């Protein structure tokens, strides 16, 4: 019975979201989301961030590895993707451009799997074509 109780109380400590390495408060660290946890930004179980933190939030340069296979490498501000970054999709396509509050914003380049480069403009995550929404 004692073994069961000990196991019952120790399991939560092995499957929590949190700082896995370094200083995830005000420095450089690794933060991993586990145990089905999500946060208000939508990071989910299996996502991992490696980079700079300020006041416990992603801030500065970092890399965000998504569980779905996508990878964002770039600037963060106050916990969200903001500034210049690259988003590499699991299908091999790449977006290089600006982000604001976790959304593509401003000009960028989409590089397809066959190497074709397309200039793209976004406004708060909405794609523009010929200066008009579509």
Task: Pin down the residues of each PLM region.
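Glycine/tyrosine- and acidic-biased, solvent-exposed loop/turn segments at the edges of beta-strands
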Residues: 12-134
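Absolute protein N-terminus
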Residues: 1-3, 17-18
């Amino acid at each position: 019975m004692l073994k069961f109780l000990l196991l019952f109380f120790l399991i939560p400590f092995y499957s929590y979201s949190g700082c896995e390495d370094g200083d995830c408060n005000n420095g450089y660290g690794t933060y991993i989301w586990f145990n089905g946890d999500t946060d208000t930004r939508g990071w989910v179980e299996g996502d991992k961030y490696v980079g700079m933190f300020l006041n416990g939030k992603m801030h500065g340069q970092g890399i965000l590895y998504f569980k779905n296979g996508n990878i964002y490498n770039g600037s963060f501000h106050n916990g969200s993707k903001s500034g210049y970054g690259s988003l590499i999709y699991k299908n091999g396509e790449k977006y290089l451009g600006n982000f604001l509050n976790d959304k593509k914003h401003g000009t960028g380049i989409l590089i397809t799997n066959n190497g074709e480069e397309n200039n793209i403009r976004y406004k708060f995550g909405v794609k523009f074509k010929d200066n008009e929404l579509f």
